[in-house]
Structure formats: structure tokens, C-alpha cells
Design a protein with these regions (language model features):
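Enzymes acting in ubiquitin/UBL processing and closely related pathways
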Residues: 1-281
Length: 281
């Protein structure tokens, strides 16, 4: 959201006995256990719950709104899961119902926003194996973007459409689910988004599968892309070097930064508790 929403403010006095076993929890129960947050340590694959916590921070902390830029919604990575992609037929609308549940989790109780009319862009975080990438729906510009740290030759996130759902590549399956949801809520951009194409972002800092442990930094790239990407409204520059060693140093720095941002965010009910304890370290 681009404006401060009082519904996401938390009372530090409400902190419960889950701390320090839980390091992040918002007022609607989205949480990150300490053991999961440790996946931000150097050399570890980032846990899905950590990427989800970052989505909640971006959604709820007004300091991450960009003046003059689109209103963005960041979905938890469980908004689209494996069974939704492998289900050949869906006569009962199970895929759309599951996606709606993911939106409810992402909106942290703000169900009045489920029609998505308050947003210009919707970010769907995908996790396939250990590979994170983003499928971004730009409702304002009526287009879609695939943002993936792996280059098009090394990525499993292919762009292949087909009349048969099961033959589509994952980004096009996500598009089908999203468009069906727009139709369900009578969104005015449903028809335009159905006709839109998916554009793969060309990233100078992209990585390849040829490097050792190609997915270790995948979550970090996704979190940085979530933070910085606003479509074609401005040049997409994340500050990443094109050189592997320098890029690794930058990812290590971002691991520390994101750990601090998540724990000290105003949407974290334990934020003030953590600040007080840090004063005595």
C-alpha cells in the first residue's frame, strides 16, 4: 500500500510468549519462526516464510511506498502452489478459491481490498523447487512481467502458452488463475489482462545454473526485485553487479539488511521487544 493503514499497526504490549521462538508475527498471525529466519544466514536457501514476511513488510510499512509510483500488492508464495498447477481440469473452481485464500493471507485481514481495485500492480511470488521468481500483473498498464534472476536460457520458468491448461508453462498457468479471479470479482481490467502478453525482464545481473549452488541466493534476488520493480515506469535497477564475486557480497549484505528490516518493522508485534533487547547487547 502507498499510504499508512492504521489497521496494520500493532501494539508491542500484545507480544506473547512465542518470542524468542518466533521473531516475526503480525497482528493477523503471519509469523516467522526463529529457525526459519536463520535461513537468512550466508550460504542458506531462504525459507518461504521469510519471503512471505518480506511481502507483509512491503505491504504494511509505508516507508516502502514509492511516491508517484503504482500501488503494489505482494502475495505470499503460497498463493499459487503445485497442485493448482498440475490440476488438469477444475470444474469446481478450486484453483481460484485457493488463490483467493492466498490473497486473504497476503492482505492480512483487509478483506475489503479483495476486489484488487485499490492496486495498480499485483506481485505473485513463485517457488518451484528452490527457485524463486515473480509473475507481476500490472493492472494499470495492462501488461504482465516475468522477473527471474535466472536468464531465459537457464530458467525453468518458460514462456509457453497453449490452449490446454496442463500444457502451458507455469507463468501462463498463473495468468489463467489470476484472470479467472479478476472475472470472479468483476474487475474492470479482466478482459484486458486476459489479452495481455507476458514479458520477461532482461536483467544484466542475471545468474546461470552453471554456478555452484545456483539457487542459494534465489530468495534474496526475489526480495530485492519485489522491493524495486515498478514495471516500465522507470528503469529497473537493483544495484546488483554483473560480476559474480561482487554480486555475492551484495547478496550477503542484503541478507543482513532484510533480517533487520523484518524484525524491526512496525508490522512486527515483537519489533519493540527486539529493539529493547538490542540496547543491552
Amino acid at each position: 500500500m502507498t499510504e499508512s493503514d492504521p489497521s496494520i499497526q500493532v501494539n508491542p504490549d500484545d507480544a506473547c510468549d512465542n518470542f524468542p521462538y518466533v521473531m516475526f508475527e503480525d497482528m493477523f498471525g503471519a509469523r516467522v519462526e526463529t529457525i526459519a529466519l536463520q535461513s537468512l544466514e550466508i550460504g542458506s536457501n531462504v525459507a518461504g516464510s521469510v519471503v512471505d514476511a518480506w511481502a507483509h513488510v512491503l505491504n504494511g510499512d509505508p516507508k516502502f511506498s514509492i511516491p508517484g509510483m503504482p500501488r503494489r500488492l505482494f502475495c505470499v508464495h503460497t498463493a499459487v502452489v503445485d497442485w493448482m498447477l498440475s490440476l488438469e481440469t477444475d470444474p469446481d473452481g478450486g484453483r481460484v478459491s485457493a488463490f483467493e485464500c492466498g490473497l486473504k493471507s497476503s492482505l492480512a485481514g483487509r478483506h475489503h481490498l479483495l476486489d484488487l481495485r485499490a492496486f495498480d500492480m499485483v506481485f505473485v511470488t513463485m517457488l518451484e523447487g528452490d527457485h524463486y521468481y515473480l509473475v507481476v500483473f500490472d493492472l494499470e498498464a495492462e501488461c504482465m512481467h516475468l522477473v527471474d534472476h535466472l536468464g531465459d536460457r537457464g530458467s525453468g520458468a518458460l514462456l509457453r502458452d497453449d490452449d490446454s491448461y496442463i500444457m502451458k508453462s507455469t507463468p501462463f498457468k498463473v495468468k489463467d488463475i489470476f484472470v479467472d479471479y479478476l472475472k470472479l470479482v468483476n474487475h474492470p481490467k479482466a478482459t484486458a489482462m486476459q489479452a495481455s502478453l507476458i514479458m520477461r525482464e532482461d536483467l544484466p545481473w542475471s545468474t546461470t545454473r552453471r554456478i555452484v549452488a545456483p539457487f542459494v541466493e534465489s530468495g534474496i534476488f526475489a526480495m530485492r526485485h519485489m522491493e524495486q520493480f515498478v514495471g516500465s515506469r522507470r528503469s529497473f535497477f537493483c544495484g546488483f553487479s554483473v560480476h559474480g564475486a561482487r554480486k555475492k557480497v551484495q547478496c550477503n549484505y542484503l541478507r543482513k539488511r532484510y533480517a533487520a528490516e523484518i524484525m524491526l518493522s512496525p508490522v512486527n508485534k515483537y519489533g519493540d521487544v527486539i529493539r529493547r533487547r538490542l540496547q543491552f547487547v
